[in-house]
Amino acid sequence: MQWLKEVWIIPNQIWISASIYCFKSMNSDQKPKINKSFATLSSRQPALTLSDSVQHALAITKRGVDELLIESEFAQKLARSELSGIPLRIKLGLDPTAPDLHLGHTVVLNKMRQLQDLGHTVIFLIGDFTSMIGDPSGRNITRPALTKEQIEDNARTYFAQASLVLDAERTEIRYNSEWCDPLGARGMIELSSKYTVARILEREDFTKRFKAGTPISVHELLYPLMQGYDSVALRADLELGGTDQKFNLLVGRELQKDWGQEPQCILTMPLLEGLDGIEKMSKSKGNYISITEPANGMFAKVMSISDVMMWRYYELLSARSLAELAQFKIEVAAGRNPRDIKVALAQEIVARFHNQQAGFDALADFDNRARGGIPDDIPEMQLSGAPLGIGQLLKQANLCASTSEALRMVEQNGVRIDGAAISDKALKVEAGTFVLQVGKRKFARITLS
């Protein structure tokens, strides 16, 4: 393959100088060495002194991160950007594997917004092509690939929801099918030659599956390469991802060197713990807060986290400055009720995804429920079968997932009818209209016949 044929697979951008033309006659053994020499040019440049504004930008970038690799390189990127006036290109790729985002997803989006507010170009990359492969990160089994129709359906809501965090007008939206589809078989083989199977198997999840004899499909081995190639196509200066994405992000650095680009730095964000404070936030674990959740429910769920976990949520989700957070901690240590600080966090999160008034209203609703009051907007339903056992009643009212769970709630004094606590698991509820309550947040107005 001639040298110039490597250039066309980078979409919409062709970087050809006079020096590149002279490489056309070189054999393939010579080219990688020449390529990598391009990528090291920046390392030969004298280090720039970091201005106060660059150091401030670096501090904002590092807030709450798990790793910033390589920090000294990124500091120099920031300094060169300030000197040249050319913003850095910041990349975040998301495969639209599910149609809705939760607060755990917004951890990395918040970091993108911080970098966006520093004046850099943020690229919201929708992995419509890689979704058809299925990211194996953190998996002990092959992730099912999505159909094109599923991907399109999920992608429709992705950016709309992400825009609740990002400034949509200043965000570049790209789809990796732009450059992955044109690759074809020849381009895919060429890309695959850039990395060895041994190196890909260094990934912890692949290593575990290989040792356990769990099948690893060939297409899964391609995923890190495809994600890395996205960085080549976009000429990314920094790529963001979760801690489970570190291997894939590092592949991007190596591929950029092979294509003669300055390698991107990588920034990994920690995975946000869910409401239980133990497992990572996940829909499958039921410990999540959806960003499309009603304001009152969102507020109440934030208030349910522990006082210790509150600081973690502040660090990863709040737009408040580090100085403000430090002051909050001083006040709590001096005796201020942590509930006050948690209320401020809950209102901030509700205001971001709804509006400020919704935050005030959610607080009023939460306080009313805490005093034993009944919300105004509770669901109403009609049921039959009176007299009906309390366990069946709670299940049919969708206030408990099962009769066994319902009876446990009765044992724990967590069930009320018209405000009166129920302690009899054998209770048969007669016909009538009444308010049924489970815990502090679940209500239903029942007409039983």
Regions found by a protein language model. Name each.
Residues 255-449:
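Conserved nucleotide- and phosphate/pyrophosphate-binding catalytic cores
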Residues 131-146, 161:
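Active-site-proximal loop->helix
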Residues 41-88:
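Positively charged, low-complexity intrinsically disordered leader regions
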Residues 65, 145-268, 275:
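Divalent-metal (Mg2+/Mn2+/Ca2+)-assisted nucleotide/phosphate chemistry catalytic cores
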Residues 74-136, 240-246, 252:
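N-terminal catalytic cores of NTP/NDP-binding nucleotidyl/phosphoryl-transfer enzymes
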